[in-house]
Design a protein with these regions (language model features):
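Phosphate- and other anionic-substrate recognition elements at nucleic-acid/protein interfaces
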Residues: 1-152
Length: 152
């Protein structure tokens, strides 16, 4: 299969940390190399990860969307790298891939071959508008609870 992104990273995000696999396609007879590292979800660590991926000349990053754990990684990496957010159901329903390390390697491999379809992640102005709309809805509901008498 043709490799579209010779330098690709796959990130499997969990509650505590993220496993990152950087896949570098070998040239000629050289084998493809993959290195897996673990990064915490602290902002400073994610920024260090961004610098690491830039230093590795990674052109494509694939992040598995799990709960809300993906958000800090996506938002901090997206401004400097080509990041694709993928649904876990679409890429990891393969038997035998049960660990975070193997999932990260699988994501990097799929990303390198261009076999992932990125999910929609709204741009910042849309996110801000959504947050404001949610906040207004919560305030309106709280106001309604205070005004209406309890039903018997």
């Amino acid at each position: 299969m043709e490799v579209i992104h010779p330098r690709c990273a796959g990130i499997d995000v969990s509650k505590r940390d993220a496993k990152v696999c950087v896949r570098i396609q070998g040239e000629g007879r050289r084998a493809t190399s993959s290195t897996v590292s673990t990064w915490t979800s602290m902002t400073s660590d994610i920024l260090a990860l961004r610098e690491h991926l830039i230093a590795q000349q990674v052109t494509c990053v694939v992040i598995e969307s799990t709960a809300a754990y993906w958000k800090p990684f996506y938002f901090l990496l997206n401004d400097a790298l080509n990041v694709g957010l993928v649904n876990a159901r679409h890429v990891c329903n393969v038997p035998g891939r049960k660990t975070d390390v193997s999932d990260a390697a699988w994501l990097a491999d799929l990303g390198a071959h261009g076999l992932v379809r990125a999910s929609f992640a709204p741009p910042e102005p849309v996110r801000i508008l959504r947050d404001l709309t949610r906040a207004r809805t919560i305030v309106a509901q709280a106001r309604t609870k205070e005004i209406e008498p309890p039903r018997v």
